[in-house]
Amino acid sequence: MDLAIIDQTHDGVSRYHHDLVESVLNFAGEALKLPVNTEMSVTFVNNDEIQRYNRDYRGVDKPTDVISFAIEEGEDDFNIISDDAWTEDIAKNIGDIIVSVDIIGAQAEYLGHSYERELGFLVVHGFLHLNGYDHMLGDAEEKEMFDLQREILDNYGLKR
């Protein structure tokens, strides 16, 4: 996977956590059988910045843990390159994930698992949204997404 990791925090995200995000997302991409040249980005921000995204794009004026911006989303969207014309030579950008580093530690502590498990959870959660999964559509969709999310994290080794 061609993954851009952007750190917009003041304190900086450790090299270890950059590598973890890259590794877990490559693992998730393999689980979904995505082409190796799939492109996406993960941007680390603070609470103020993610609140701005949440307010401007979702109409919710408070911080959140992760926001996903899929390139192709919903029934009204169309493929820029048709599925028939798609080749391994053409990279497909699936979108962007924004993660609040301020929330990762607090949620990990509250839920009783490691910072790494929470970080993995959030990026896999966002990644699944970029790939068309949506837990907000109903009980069946929620179960499908959360089961796949848990399976990916467990198989990777980030268990609760």
From Swiss-Prot:
UniProt superkingdom: Bacteria
Gene Ontology MF terms: metalloendopeptidase activity; RNA endonuclease activity; zinc ion binding
Signal peptide from the UniProt entry: none
Comment on bound cofactor: Binds 1 zinc ion.
Subcellular location: Cytoplasm
GO cellular component: cytoplasm
Gene3D superfamilies for this protein: Metalloproteases ('zincins'), catalytic domain
UniProt GO BP: rRNA processing
Family, as annotated: Belongs to the endoribonuclease YbeY family.
Name recorded for this polypeptide: Endoribonuclease YbeY
Originating organism: Leuconostoc citreum (strain KM20)
